[in-house]
Structures are given as structure tokens and as C-alpha cells.
Amino acid sequence: MDLLTWLSLREGIGHRDDAAAAGFSPVRVRAAIRTGGVQRIRARWIALPSAPVELKRAAAAGGALTCVSLARRRKWWVPPEADDALHVHLPGHESIREGGLRAHWAKPLGPTRPRSLEASVEDALAHAAECFELDQATAIWESAIRTEAITLDSLQQVKWRSTAARRVAEHTRNDTGSSLETISHVRLSGWGVRLRFQVHLAGHDVDFVIGTHLIVQVDGWAYHSSSADRTRDIAHDAELRLRGYTVFRFSSAQIMYDWPSVERILIAAISRGAHLAPFRA
């Protein structure tokens, strides 16, 4: 196997110590660098020109991808307004060497893989808890649960060091189907009114029930794949109203970008007793 093939099997980037262990002498590595087939990154990393930019930048920074940058790479949900900076987990002795980086210097939560360019899932989630508001951080955590081979129980057993991470761990669930549902759930919690999630009523599940009779439906990002879906939802809402429920349906845009209006409507409904069973004389 030649050096280029070896690198291609490692996502295009590798540490020179690993290359040496694989039988590639410093002379062969330097020759590959001279011909332009391999790039040198700092003193100890080498990469193909086609290697992922974020990995090359992490190597150049002397750290590992973390927080929202690892979330993007591993295809977790990312808040639409998240910054474009590269978030890197750096050892305590490293400093930022280029612009466009966001450094996280916290001590790793557990042992780290030698020369890894990706922080552990736990460290990345801890950093996300520090970088984002509770609702968005919780959505990132729950997306990681859906994407990675981790469980809610395992996350809740981690000895989180920051108050922010412990708070997110308390709010994280494993039964939400989307990040939009997660954000809605976090924002609706803590009002001092009973909140239930994914309740089966009148033949179909509803997203949230506040109290006993106030229903909140959240239409997702890809709302309605067909007119039949829309017709079914309208019919279900009508049946719920006939049974005495108050039903509000909000779009993803309202939840994400106009939450104060959503909150105002729901608080007004609660103040009028819409969350309580209707009085029947």
C-alpha cells in the first residue's frame, strides 16, 4: 500500500507517527510532500489535498472538532442561526493560531483517543450546552441520541461538570421525533401547568396537551407531503373541538422565529381556562 492509499483510508488525513508505524519512513513522507501529492499540516500531520477542510483546520489548530462543528460533521441537528466558526477542543497548552475558530479548553470528560481530530460525543455535547440556549442545546443532544449509538440513560450517568450541561441532561428525552418537537417541549415546560407529549386523542396522536384540554400541534419543517395529510389534520382538529378541546396549530417558522407571539397566545388561552375541562351544567 502506498502513502496516498493509506491516507485515503483515513479520510485523507493522518498523523506522521501513525504513518511511521504503518511502515512509511520520514524519507517517503517528505518525498510525497515535495511532489505535492501530500500536504504537511504543522509538524506532525499530513493530508491529501482532498481531505475534509474541517479536519485539516482542526489538525492545524492542534485540537479536535467539537460542539456545533462536530454536530455538522456527524449530521446532528444544528440550529439554523449557529455561527460558521470552527469549534475546536484544544489542550490547555494550545492557543488559537488562525481566525474563524472558537476554542473550548475544558478538560475532557473521559479518556480521549490519541491523535483524534474529533472530540468525544460527550465532550461535544458539553460544549454545545455552553454555546446554546437550553432549548437548542437540548435539541442537539436529542438529535445525537437519535443519530449515535448512545442512550438517554448513558448520558444521564455522565458526571457533567458544568451547570449548563447538567441542566440540559435533566431536560433531554428520548421520545421526541424531531428537534422542533424538542424545542417546543422545552419552551412549554416550567409554566406550572401539567404538560403531556404525544397523547393519543380522537384516533390520532397530538403533539402536546397543556392541562387537560389545551392542545398544541406543531407542523414540522416538511409540513404535509400531500393534500390528504392536510385534510386529515383539519378533520382531526375539528373532532377534537367537538369533544371540548381547544386546539392551536403552529408552523415551524412560528416556533423558531416568532416564539413570543406563540407564547402570548398560549398564555392568553391558559388565563381564560382553555386548559381546563369545560364546565357542563
Language model: regions and residue ranges:
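Short gly/ser-rich loop at a beta-strand->alpha-helix junction or flexible surface loop bordering the NTP-binding
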Residues: M1-S162, V168, S271-A281
